[in-house]
Regions:
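N-terminal membrane topogenic signal
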Residues: 1-10
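Selected transmembrane alpha-helices and immediately adjacent juxtamembrane segments
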Residues: 9-22, 29-49, 53, 148-230
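Transmembrane helix-loop junctions in multi-pass membrane proteins
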Residues: 19-30, 56-60, 131-133, 141, ...
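Membrane helical hairpin/interfacial module
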Residues: 42, 46-100
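Transmembrane helical segments that form the transport core of multi-pass membrane transport proteins
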Residues: 59, 190, 194-272
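Hydrophobic alpha-helical transmembrane segments
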Residues: 63, 85-86, 117, 144-149, ...
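Alpha-helical membrane segments and immediately flanking helix-loop junctions
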Residues: 74-138, 240-259, 265-289
Length: 318
């Protein structure tokens, strides 16, 4: 009973929050559904399906053989792990986690390597960093590319910092399966992508409802206002920080109107690298059966490191 007390209390608090602020929760859920249907499904589903086809046809295995020496030296993982790192950086959240889950499920990597890869292989793609953050917030694709570059460098740095003391990862825990034909690979990939995108939608809708309900309760505005008063930073800065800590897209949207300063660029970089609890939940659903503890530690470190790099780089450039 005592062991589960926090979970019981949190569940009861959420139930009461949604009960007393049901109208706000309903509107937030509707906004989350709209975000999922109009932005996330069109932008993520094709990438998930394409990555699934490549994995099922053995393209990742072929790339892994070429990347194996560098992957072992830099990260202490197999070549498949390095291939997932590149997939995650190109496709965005949570493609890296989904790819790790697929490789673990088909026996290409072990449980230990899979959980280690979640430290640094699930990242934002350039489309979101440039489009939503660079152009959408700062009005510049150039700033977006710089922030995504720092994001990629910081992810690699976390992977190197927590390098596994192995020689290129372990052997597969299952014998390699026969490569399916293209039709079977496409069908399986699309079905898996559909399941993953539905899970992502559930998390986005839930966290959108949560943010709306907390807003009606007065959080995060009360805490953001107190910090803004004490530190002297804009209220919108801390509102974006607290919102983005929960859900990335909402946090980036809350940054609209912030002046272009090293501090605001560092904030955007932190949110991009941390990803938000919503993205962490999506990663857990996409990589079912794997523990997320290492991932949370790695993403928090990546967020702090990338924010510091962004602040220094912006201070030099501006």
């Amino acid at each position: 009973m005592k062991r589960h007390f926090f979970g019981y209390a949190a569940g009861a608090a959420l139930f009461l929050l949604f009960l007393f602020y049901s109208a706000d929760a309903r509107q937030g859920a509707a906004d989350g559904l709209r975000l999922w249907g109009t932005l996330l499904v069109p932008s993520l589903l094709p990438y998930f399906a394409a990555a699934g086809v490549l994995t099922r046809l053995g393209a990742v295995d072929a790339l892994a053989r070429r990347l194996a020496p560098a992957a072992a030296r830099l990260f202490g993982v197999s070549g498949a792990g390095a291939a997932v790192f590149l997939l995650g950086l190109s496709g965005g959240y949570p493609l890296g986690a989904a790819s790790v889950g697929t490789l673990y499920e088909n026996g290409t990597i072990t449980n230990d390597e899979a959980e280690h890869l979640l430290l640094f292989c699930d990242n934002s793609g350039p489309a979101f960093a440039v489009g939503a953050l660079g152009v959408g917030v700062f009005g510049s694709a150039g700033w977006g590319m710089l922030l995504w570059g720092i994001h990629a460098i910081s992810a690699a740095a976390v992977g190197i910092l927590f390098r596994r003391r192995t020689r290129g990862g372990e052997a597969p825990i299952k014998p390699p399966r026969k490569t399916p034909d293209f039709g079977a690979a496409l069908g399986g990939a699309v079905a898996a992508a559909g399941q993953t995108i539905l899970q992502i939608g559930a998390y986005v809708i839930f966290f959108s409802a949560l943010i709306a309900s907390l807003g009606a309760l007065g959080f995060p505005d009360t805490l953001a206002g107190e910090l803004a008063f004490r530190i002297g930073a804009p209220l919108s800065f801390f509102r974006a920080l607290f919102t983005g800590a929960l859900e990335l897209s909402s946090g980036i949207g809350a940054m609209a109107g912030l002046p272009l300063t090293p501090g605001s660029l560092a904030l955007g970089e932190f949110l991009l690298s941390w990803g938000g609890l919503c993205v962490h939940g999506q990663a857990g659903a996409a990589a079912e059966g794997l523990k997320m503890r290492k991932r949370l530690r790695g993403k928090l470190l990546q967020g702090v490191f990338s924010a510091a790099l962004a602040y220094v780089a912006a201070s030099i450039i501006m």
